[in-house]
Amino acid sequence: MLPLKSMTLNEQTDLLHVDAGALWADVIPYLDRYGRSIEVMQSDNNFTVGGSLSVNCHGWQYGRPPIASTVESFHLMTADGTVLRSSRTENKELFSLALGGYGLFGIILDADLHVVRNERLKMEQAVVPLDDAMALFDRKLHERGTPRMFFARLNIAPHRMFDDVLITNFYTEKGDIPKLKSPKLVGLRKLLFRGSVGSEFGKEVRWQAETKLAPVLAGTTFSRNQLLNESSGWFLDHSDATTDILHEYFLPPDMAVPFLKQARTIIRAHHEDLLNVTVREVQTDNDTFLNYADQPMIAFVMFFDQRRTVDADQDMGQMTRELIDVVLHSHGRYYLPYRLHASGDEFLAAYPQAEDFFHLKRKYDPDNLFENEFYLKYARP
């Protein structure tokens, strides 16, 4: 799909027609020339449009549902080779199934996406105790209004795990929009991040750098496109001995802090090397069948370093299931694209609509042309 990456912007309707193989790294500079920006995407630009739609990614654009909410229509090649246009009014069942459908209903060939204006944004940050974080954020909303972008990070130093939260908001600001440039401080950020692997001292140094040094070195004024134009390459593990493991959990806002306190106990008990927790919010997804945001959610993206051994993988699986159990008891859900550690019962508890989803899968693809490990584990065809 990667060669399929053409794109055209309709400036009158703010609709971007883009091939599924285009990377966000291709799309962002293109839109920047027209003063436009992607409405919803994940935090890294080295993903394809088609892949992002297939997992129904969400981002740190505040007050927004996942990316499916920005899709006007797309073309889908189905199991019999037919190419269908799908939207909320045309082949609408396939619209809800293919978005966030993990490739099980066909191949998304292209899409029409709603885009927004590029803007000048001012960063404001605060470090607060975990128990005060939700109240402070609500107070900030009342005082400053709705931010355009938002994320938070948790202190992951073992002796202070989750005790402190770095809240980062981006508000619109008058003035010229900064030109799109290459990301700053990539080498330093990589050194600090990878230097925190297996090191309590490294994690403490990184926290101090993120909370005190980064705003001074990187600045506080950005364009929206600059914030989106970041690759995951700088923080990835290239070792043969270890690998990166991602988790993501979605909690109702009133259960977010209680979940973290229980998660801290579980992670410490398993002695897993937690490198990062990013916090985002996501609004209700009314577009996809297998939706993870069935209500407004707080999302916790956890990033672990794991040794490439059978024992390490088994322990990671056990810890994951324990975390998922806490999520389920908190009326939350977990994100499906990552490792298949969840049990079948946990999967069905998190996604009670899954049996109907798989039934429709077999309706549209009776010969199971489109399969993946997720389908083979949980659908039991």
Put a short name on every predicted segment.
Residues M1-P381:
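Noncatalytic alpha-helical scaffold of FAD-dependent oxidoreductases
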